[in-house]
Amino acid sequence: MSDATLAADPPRLYLASASPRRRELLLQIGLTHTVLRVPAPPGEDEPQHPGEAACDYVRRTARDKAERGQAWLHSQQLPDLPLLAADTTVILDGIVLGKPADRADALRMLAALSGREHEVHAAVALCHQGRLYEDVSITRVRMRALEQAELQRYCDSGEPYGKAGAYGIQGLAGAFVSHIAGSYTGVMGLPIYETAALLRSAGIAVP
């Protein structure tokens, strides 16, 4: 199934993600789109393969999402438009921090990130006219040292859940970040510079 955007202009691409942040970022650069709700495969997030580099892992998961979306698109006989997928992963000491399973997991991740620098890898994959285009942005983020009471209040807000690394830089956790080097929109979940470059390389005009 698909959900049309509220924008009056006809959609120019499919977004294989239900993330409201990714939707907002696409609309921010004038890209009307339709959210393609692709049935998720069984199980949780795709695990990192033994020996697989974090950058390769996030690239693979974005590619898999795009390819599943393309297959679903064809199975539903929907109009053929470019299809965009993305994946974001937080990396600390070479270890992938995915979405927290529960409050204890969120507290564990946030405590590990406190006072330290980590990386956010954001991959985008575009399927268009039988070709796959992909790229990854890598951003370094430093969090200030956080008090246990702050972590508890943050978890009380509900914001950590459903987010890689248990935080969202565009929300309350923005006050935790002391330094960022790279793509702010990549940390949000969709690196706009890389996304626009992929679209242009596929011959799709970007405002």
Swiss-Prot record:
EC annotation from Swiss-Prot or TrEMBL: 3.6.1.9
Location in or out of the cell: Cytoplasm
Superkingdom of source: Bacteria
Keywords from the UniProt entry: Cytoplasm, Hydrolase, Nucleotide metabolism
Gene3D superfamilies from the UniProt entry: 3.90.950.10
Pfam families assigned to the protein according to its UniProt record, in alphabetical order: Maf
GO molecular function annotations of the record: dTTP diphosphatase activity; UTP diphosphatase activity
UniProt function note: Nucleoside triphosphate pyrophosphatase that hydrolyzes dTTP and UTP. May have a dual role in cell division arrest and in preventing the incorporation of modified nucleotides into cellular nucleic acids.
Stated family: Belongs to the Maf family. YhdE subfamily.
Record-given protein name: dTTP/UTP pyrophosphatase
Species for this entry: Bordetella pertussis (strain Tohama I / ATCC BAA-589 / NCTC 13251)
